[in-house]
Amino acid sequence: CPQRSERLGWTGDAQVFAPTASYHMDTRAFFHKFIKDLRDEQKELDGGMPNFLPNIGHKEKAGSVWGDIATFLPNTLYTYFGNEEEMEYCYPLMKDWVDFIDRGDAARGERKYLFDFMDTFGDWLALDGPTPTSFKGSTNDTFISSV
């Protein structure tokens, strides 16, 4: 979270920013190392993904978005650089993440194939209904097309 002067490599942020970074520069070496570190942590987490790297003692498994880096990042690298060998290198990472989600789904006795069973951060989202206070801001309504 660069807006918070964060120092950890949050996987959700890396997943979201990887396409932009890869568009602007050659990120292959950087993200190859990042993927290697992800894979090392994934082995410790039984197929789950860490929330950040380096994983400094926080052994909770990531939820959706943060963990989805296992599939999105390899796809981003393939999209921008077309390296099939990197995709082959990433296949165990991707497969173990998908299998982890599948096992979690099955453990609940459901087969929804929807990853909605772990904690997510979402600290900036209010998913549980409207707030009693308006957060509109001070911009004059005539300048806002959606108001």
List where the protein language model places each region.
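Alpha-helical scaffold elements that line and support the substrate/ligand-binding pocket
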Residues: 17, 70-79
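Active-site acid/base region of carbohydrate-active enzymes
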Residues: 1-52, 61, 80-144
